[in-house]
């Protein structure tokens, strides 16, 4: 299963908890600029909330974001599990 960058970030925040943009970018394998743009989109979608502690931006899942991230992780793990069994 291929995840979009948005989906990948949601799962990263689910697994690791609140993180700075730079750490999310590193874990997702994307640039900090791309990460910032994606974080803004996730914020606009109501899936994450950000706390600004100068000069840092700490991001965490909202309740809705948590529900979606859990479901995405479950689906991706099921797909991977089924793929491995068929090899």
Regions found by a protein language model. Give the residues of each.
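Short, Lys/Arg-rich nucleic-acid/phosphate-binding segment
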Residues: 52-58
């Amino acid at each position: 299963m291929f995840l979009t960058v948005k989906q990948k970030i949601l799962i990263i925040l689910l697994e690791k908890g609140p993180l700075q943009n730079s750490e999310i970018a590193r874990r997702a394998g994307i640039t900090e600029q791309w990460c910032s743009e994606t974080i803004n989109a996730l914020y606009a979608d109501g899936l994450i909330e950000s706390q600004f502690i100068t000069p840092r931006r700490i991001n965490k899942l909202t309740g809705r974001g948590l529900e979606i991230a859990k479901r995405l992780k479950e689906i991706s793990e099921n797909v991977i599990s089924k793929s491995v069994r068929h090899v």
